[in-house]
Amino acid sequence: MFSNTLVTTEDLAAHLDDPKWVILDCRFTLTDPEAGRETYAKAHIPWARYVHLDDDLSAPPTDATGRHPLPDPRVLTEKLCAWGIGVNKQVVVYDDSYGAMAVRLWWMMRWLGHPGVALLDGGYPKWLREKRPVDADLPIPHKAACACLPEPTQIVGADEVMHASRSGDQLIIDARPDRRFTGEYEPLDPVAGHVPGAINYPFDENLDVDGTFLPPEALRENYQALLKGKPAWQVIHMCGSGVTACHNILAMEIAGLPGSRLYPGSWSEWIHDPARPVATGE
């Protein structure tokens, strides 16, 4: 039985030598793109392979895209195969930012039709706090056969976001920190603010004080308060570039509210077109 949402540090520790488990290290810092790779080289969870947000999980950005466009599904599938991710594999993704980066790969693998992927709850910080093993060895890859079955209904484009903004028939949830949403502070993108009609729910609201996810019942209560009767399929998630928005998608899955969708281009794509409206404040 595979997990498709969260895996505990205890479960991962018990399966470190299990050939049916594949571990992927997704540590990444938006303001220092090589920091994650460098820290991985110094120490990581045994058998973990490194996955880079820019190089592996994104296509090169253009003047019309956000900062982290989705890669060609076939290219990503080839990488998954090279990392040994075939059928009947439990994939565990982790980072050192409580899932903020690793959730991108969690979402992308589900988008490609691989349900057996889970986030390490509490991530690398919890693993270290518990004094679990780390090493600097590079695992030898064993190529696997895997399928590429992208599901287009999980993705929303800018036109649908524009319609939702104007009509209100879908709920747009922005996962960025409050100050970026209001436009008070914008360290990454040239325009500050948010899509008119969107609501702000920073991804770290999904976390308990120890950096693990809140219990399912607490997440469900929180999201039902946001949805106000709307079904999950009428929810569009966004953030700065389609990364931390996946954290809210995962939280809704844990809460028993599956079916919400991602706007991959997010804010950094939205602002490329000056015809798209921008709001500031709450």
Annotate each language-model stretch with its function.
Residues 1-282:
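Cytosolic catalytic domains that perform sulfur/thiol-centered chemistry
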